[in-house]
Amino acid sequence: MGPTGRQSPSSLPVPAGGPCLLLLFCLRLGASCPQNCQCPDHAGAVAVHCSARGLQEVPRDIPADTVLLKLDANKIARIPNGAFQHLHQLRELDLSQNAIETIGPAAFSGLAGGLRLLDLSHNRLRRIPKDALGKLSAKIRLAHNPLHCECALQEALWELKLDPDSVDEIACHTSVQEEYVGKPLIQALDSGVSFCSVHHKTTDVAMLVTMFGWFAMVITYVVYYVRQNQEDARRHLEYLKSLPSTPMSKDPTSSAP
């Protein structure tokens, strides 16, 4: 007890469970942000900034209550299935300026209902993973990817909600119709072009070539069969002609009178 009769702070009783609660609180603070990332306050919500950290894969220790996640300007090449399945409160996901080439069909499972913006611009996507993106209601940015303009891409775009601010920057890096290489995809589609019609024409030509091949084989076999039968018939006829003729035998019942 101090000189004034009051207890010193060090002598105050510690509430039951106090050290444990303090330890849990410290652990929660330490685990609230992935290593090498920053988690600033974002309007009272959890924001995780992992931009330009040299990451080669999506971190696994992202807090479950994250609302904004920035993974841009890294070296991520692949988004595996279930990479964000525990982030049910996520609203914005920035994966731009990476090296993403493949996206698993269930890469964004768990985000379909809440995600509002998905940025996949400036990556290495040649084809749109319709199974992964088709179920999302979020605005999607796909600009500056080396997309191959074909029927599958056109069909995938019909199911996506593209970000209107960047849709004009989606261009054909390669195309089934070479005249559209380097041109904005939306401009090509607005002109009335259908990459699917080219696909169907190619399929029809292949089918016609196959049918013609089978028809030619059948005709060849029929001609060979007819000629072989004619040759056999000719040989048989020559054989019959080569046989010696036999004189007719006299009828024993007939006698001279």
Swiss-Prot record:
**SUPFAM superfamilies, per this entry?**
L domain-like
Q: Which UniProt keywords apply?
A: Leucine-rich repeat, Membrane, Repeat, Signal, Transmembrane, Transmembrane helix
- Leader sequence residues: 1-32
List residues of the LRRCT domain. Answer: 145-198
Task: Give the residue spans that cross the bilayer.
Answer: 205-225
**Subcellular location field:** Membrane
Its protein name is: Leucine-rich repeat-containing protein 3
